[in-house]
Amino acid sequence: MSKSSVHTLLTTLDQRGYVRRLDDQRYTIGIRAWQVGCVATPLWMSRVAGPYMTELVNKVADGAALAVLDGVETVCIQLVESTQVVRVHDNIGNRCLAWCVSNGISMLATMQDEEVLRLLPDPLPRPTEFSFASEAEVLDKLAEVRAVGHSLMRRTWRPDTSGISLPVRGADNRTVAALCVSMPDYRATPDRLDETLAELRHTVRQIEREFGVTEPDASPFPIQKGVLAAQ
């Protein structure tokens, strides 16, 4: 196949969501390919992460979800629910607004602010009264996440739930997903969040090792460039 034919094919696949073009001009699998693959077999990432997520849920007693980013939405690709009577319910395949959930904020924080701004709609839909009302509020939250190393979101997607999340990197040390633990907001006490975060970090390290991460101690959050970084 000629180079021009390959380029035309990749362009078509990119437009239809089956592949996604990276900043370095390489391509990675797109969300539509994942959706097609889910009909026949679970996504490789979800299969690998599943056992570790089960261990995590057994330790923290709240549910865990692995999500990927599709534009400005997150898509849940693996889920282990808590056995507690009062728990956060979700479904594999569910989509959420990325700026409203901890998984989404974790992944957005690994991007340059300029790229995030290109994705955000104007105005921002607000599922709850606690959701971000402006792009500036989103950027402030992303800066906070980069500083502390994790994402904590309270009542921004559902008015009675909280979530804490970390990005998950792949073999090229790029962020490929995010893992969160969600809980009813009344259970999100400082002590419980600290304990959950410690277990979450351990689980992400295990999953990243399986994914082939070669720089486990490197930060997933980039140094910000351009005009916004200087403001």
Language-model features: locations:
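Short amphipathic alpha-helical signal-transduction/dimerization elements
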Residues: L108, Q112, R201-E208, G212
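Charged catalytic carboxylate motif
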Residues: S5, R32, V48, E137, ...
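Short, highly charged C-terminal tails/helix-capping segments
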Residues: G212-Q231
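Amphipathic alpha-helical effector-binding/dimerization core
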Residues: Q25-D122
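Extended hydrophobic
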Residues: F130-V204, I223
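Acidic surface patches and DE-rich sequence motifs
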Residues: L22, D70, G170
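N-terminal helix-turn-helix
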Residues: M1-L43, R205, R209-V213
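A short, flexible beta-alpha/helix-coil linker loop
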Residues: A33-V36, P125-R126, P184-A188
